[in-house]
Amino acid sequence: MKSASPARACGIDFGTSNSTVGWLRPGVETLIALEDDKITLPSVVFFNMEERRPVYGRLALHEYLEGYEGRLMRSLKSLLGSKLIKHDTSVLGTAMPFKDLLGLFIAQLKKRAEATAGREFEEVVLGRPVYFVDDDPLADQEAENTLTDVARAIGFKE
């Protein structure tokens, strides 16, 4: 059940290996459980060929290690600031822009956080490293802009 009170912003730490979502409620700082009772979600997507669907986090790793046919994609954050972000990759037999791949994962973080918190998050604070790309201010700014664009595309207003 969704809360009737106004939504507050969440904070997303989109990490290379793991991601977390936090929520500041009045007087309470909370890291939100994203997978079972765990506050981290491995930054992994597995596209299961048999079931023609993406799975995320520990389940993605499990299905991959169990030998399901598909494609495992890790370290998604490393796409930010790279030239690959402007290209497509093959997923379940079709071309998918890498930017859309990032959107799938970040949308999953948003969806899981909202389900656990019982409310929608319309605003987000996106964590970022000091530099997405060392010694290249333009690529670093492009990485930040891409992350912001992805957040807006999946429904964050600010």
List the predicted regions and their residue ranges.
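Charged, flexible boundary elements
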Residues: M1, K157-E158
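Phosphate-binding loop and its immediate beta->loop->alpha context
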Residues: G27-K157
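Gly/Thr-rich phosphate-binding beta-strand-loop-beta motif of the actin/hexokinase/Hsp70
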Residues: K2-L31
